[in-house]
Each structure stands twice: as C-alpha cells, then as structure tokens.
Amino acid sequence: MHIFGKILGAFFGLLLGGPFGLLFGLFIGHQFDKARRLSQAGFSTGGFGKGPSQAQRQEEFFKAAFAVMGHVAKAKGQVTKEEIQLATAMMDRMNLHGEQRRAAQDAFREGKESDFPLEDVLVRVKISTAGRFDLLQFFLELQISAAFADGAIHPSERNVLHKIARGLGFSSEQLERRLQMQEAAFRFQHQGGFHGQQQGQYQSSGWQQASQADQLADAYKILDVSPEADGKTVKRAYRKLMNEHHPDKLMAKGLPPEMMNVAKEKSQEIQNAYDLIKKVKGFK
C-alpha cells in the first residue's frame, strides 16, 4: 500500500489548518502517492521540459500492457494457472528475454496489487499513444485476449474490461462488440482456423456441415459483419480491419517493436477469416 503521502499530508494539514486542512492534506498526499506509485512502476508523471521520446512512450505502452493484464487476471480474486500461462506465452510470442522479460513480469505483478492505479495508468497510455485509435484498440484487444485465457470471461473480468474501455475512450457497445469478435476468434483458432481445416477434413469430402457452419459463423463475427452481407460489404469490412491492424502501420504510429509478432498474428487471423468466407461463398 502506498499511503505515506496521505499520512504526511493529513498530519501537516491538520496541524496547520484543522479539519479543512486535514482534508486538503489528504488530497495532496493522495496525489503524491499516485505519482510515486506510477514512477515506481516505470511510468512518466509529466512535468516541465521536453515530452517523452518515442522510445519512452513505447516503453510506457509496453509496461502498461502487462500491468493492466495482471490487473485483469486478478479481477476474479485469484490469478489462475491459465492466466499465468497466457502471460508467459505472450512474452514468448514477443521473444522477450533478459531485462525485457523481467520488466514484463514485474509489470504483471504490479498490476495484481490491490492499490494498482488503473485509471492513472490508462491516462498515461492515452498520452503515450497521443490518443491514436489504432494503438488504443490494440491495447484493449490485448486485454480482452488475456481475459479469454481460460476460454470464458468472468463477470468480474468483464467489469474491469468495461473500466479499461471507458478509460481508453471506448463505449460499452464498442467493447461488447470486440468481446464477441474475440470469442469467435478464440473458437476459430482452437478449431484450426481456415488454413488448419484445409490440411485435414477439407481435403477430400469437405467439412461436416455443422463444423463448416460454425467456422463460417465465427469468421463473419471476426470481421464484424452479418452472415447475410454481400461480397462488397465483407471486403469493405476486411479492408477496414486490416488497415487498423496492419503491423507496419501500427509500428509507424508507435507500437513497441516487441509487440510486432502479436500484431502480425492478429492480422493473419483477420486474413484467415476473410479467406474462409471467400472460399465458402465464392467471393472474388
């Protein structure tokens, strides 16, 4: 717990200004504790002079991603084995070793603390990304992916995700839509996806109808379009998502280089869903 500032502020506030001074001292002390906590977690707290460099902004984004991931994992009261495995797998996907891996692990542990300043960290994320929609969306989707570590969203995790979405500037409707997309992506991936199915059932007699229908339904949800959508609508949705998730474009906007592989996997997921719809529906 970080309460040193509150205690000190309350003491001097009461000493110098009575009850009103006590309240003012508590407020000032609280601000001090928040700034100290953010600084210890590796986040810039602003101030005068030059703003953070690109490398510093990327570092903030990186640490915040793992810290908030830890906060989501702790939402149910206890971090599960699956959630720890997902965080470890995420570090593996990013090829994190040595200092980088330790920084990610430290941030994840920081996020699990009961007094983790979620709202303040999200403010820092918005500042470090200059409010760029694509980067904020990537950050939110990363947290959603973490919440799906065990294949389902717990109500407590959903509540935390709503706080994260609001803090980043997304509406509840936008979050729920992304939750549906991620749930479909989770099923799509664990069923082998389009290219995985091509290697097996589809080679000779095709998929079983139920399997094909489920895969196709998930592919439409990944692209966030209706199953009744025509080819032009599907292609437009595909291009929009690819433009928002293109790894090179995200890197140019400030995505940490360590997260490039995760961005590539997301764009491949979108590509696979589009390829499946084209194959089954005969779109060109």
UniProtKB/Swiss-Prot annotation:
Segments on the Periplasmic face: 1-6
Molecular functions (GO terms): protein-folding chaperone binding
Transmembrane helix found in the keyword field: yes
Segments crossing the lipid bilayer: 7-30
Domain J: 218-284
Keywords: Cell inner membrane, Cell membrane, Chaperone, Membrane, Transmembrane, Transmembrane helix
Database matches in Gene3D superfamilies: DnaJ domain, TerB-like
GO cellular component: plasma membrane
Cytoplasmic compartment segments: 31-284
Chief location bin: membrane
Membrane-related topology note: Single-pass type III membrane protein
Database matches in InterPro entries: DjlA, DjlA_DnaK_co-chaperone, DjlA_N, DnaJ_domain, J_dom_sf, TerB-like
Domain notes: The transmembrane domain is a dimerization domain.
Role of this protein: Regulatory DnaK co-chaperone. Direct interaction between DnaK and DjlA is needed for the induction of the wcaABCDE operon, involved in the synthesis of a colanic acid polysaccharide capsule, possibly through activation of the RcsB/RcsC phosphotransfer signaling pathway. The colanic acid capsule may help the bacterium survive conditions outside the host.
Subunit details: Homodimer.
Record protein name field: Co-chaperone protein DjlA
Biological source species: Vibrio parahaemolyticus serotype O3:K6 (strain RIMD 2210633)
Gene: djlA
